[in-house]
Amino acid sequence: MKKTIVLAYSGGLDTSAIIPWIKDNYNFDVVAFVADIGQSKKDLYKIKEKAIISGASDCYISDLKDIFVKKYVFPMLKTGAIYEGEYLLGTAIARPLIAKAQVDYAKKINAIGLCHGSTGKGNDQVRFELAYSALAPSLLVIAPWREWKFQSREDLLKYLKTKNIVTNVNKKKIYSRDENIFHVSTEGGILEDPWNPANEDCWFWTKSPLNAPNKPKKISLKIEKGCVVSINNKFFNEFNCLKRLNKIGAKHSIGRIDIVENRLIGMKSRGCYETPGGTIIYKALRSLEQLVFDRECMYWKNKIALQLSSIIYDGKWFTPIRKSLQKSSDILSSSISGKVVVELYKGSVRILQKKSLNSLYSKKYVTFGKDNVYNQIDAKGFIRLFSLSSRIRALKNKK
């Protein structure tokens, strides 16, 4: 009986080529493992058949949609993690869950190893293999992009042709696309030159701002402990909440970014990322934090968010430091409850209204009109003490 490898299978060009390549070079059976994390249903319907045609002995589809949003996406959004000021980590946050589910399935069927289709130039190879190391250090890991002779996706197309395996990718439209319920990314093709403008082929979900509605859209979000629980007074679970906001946001061109980012391994890469629902939630949560957090809480929350963004981007999900920082962030976010009204218009998210029972904002204290709660003379003593070190230094230098 042949030994079995479990491949994290997407149905795309790379993983379709990996199946026959492993059979040719390792003489292992390949079981394709597909994580359903909310990508297009149209793709999922065809994916099992495609895996078998490509040579897989079996294809297992694991429904991870709800757990992905509930245990990964929403907790991350609550932290405020955002990489290099723009990227909401839509691909990075999916990798730990896919790897964990893949490992669990490999153990269940007594497979001897794991395989992924990440390139030797990218971040995902690190993310997958850090998770494998944390969860199943004894299993064999195969990373074909670091072994095979193919140098490009064009080479893969030629290889699949020799195997009589049909793919819907062609040389003119050779983008690498990654999709889940939270985010879709497009890389490669014309995007490899930063001087090339991204055309509409590079955008998969969202309408162009030019074609978005001319009338702004207002939506009301209820937030409890850092999580959106209702949209326009209709309650949804986490998955359906994100799905609904994606639909609304995509129509209004929300969540498009075209960025050059610093990869973990040292090089820069360019991608077009779409995160419509996530962008709306991110903006709403940060807006409510402005009402609720004092200066010190805001400082530490932002610092934790910055650290977590790198930890998640680098694939260090299954580490004590990620768990510790996230727990700290959860404690801070326990007071983030309230209501936010946002306006969506041709790619922009504008906060119109916000309120919270935990708000530290006091109109009585900040009014420019007459008030009876704040004695402005008190500021004199505060400033004198606050400037003490500066005055001592100045007096010393004067000597």
UniProtKB/Swiss-Prot annotation:
Keyword Ligase: yes
Pathway linked to the protein: Amino-acid biosynthesis; L-arginine biosynthesis; L-arginine from L-ornithine and carbamoyl phosphate: step 2/3
Pfam families found in the cross-reference section: Arginosuc_syn_C, Arginosuc_synth
Keywords: Amino-acid biosynthesis, Arginine biosynthesis, ATP-binding, Cytoplasm, Ligase, Nucleotide-binding
Family statement: Belongs to the argininosuccinate synthase family. Type 1 subfamily.
Alphabetical list of Gene3D superfamilies matching this protein: Argininosuccinate synthetase, chain A, domain 2 (3.90.1260.10), HUPs (3.40.50.620), Single helix bin (1.20.5.470)
One annotated GO molecular function: ATP binding
Provenance organism: Buchnera aphidicola subsp. Cinara cedri (strain Cc)
Taxonomic lineage from the root: Bacteria, Pseudomonadati, Pseudomonadota, Gammaproteobacteria, Enterobacterales
Binding site for L-citrulline: Y87, N123, R127, S176, S185, E261, Y273
Residues bound to ATP: A8, Y9, S10, G11, G12, L13, D14, T15, S16, A35, G117
Source superkingdom: Bacteria
Protein name, entry field: Argininosuccinate synthase
Reactions mediated catalytically: L-citrulline + L-aspartate + ATP = 2-(N(omega)-L-arginino)succinate + AMP + diphosphate + H(+)
Top EC class, one word: ligase
GO terms of biological process kind: argininosuccinate metabolic process; L-arginine biosynthetic process; urea cycle
NCBIfam families in UniProt: argG, PRK00509.1
Location(s) in or outside the cell: Cytoplasm
CDD domains in the record: ASS (cd01999)
EC nos: 6.3.4.5
GO CC aspect terms: cytoplasm
Assembly behavior: Homotetramer.
Residues reported to bind L-aspartate: T119, N123, D124
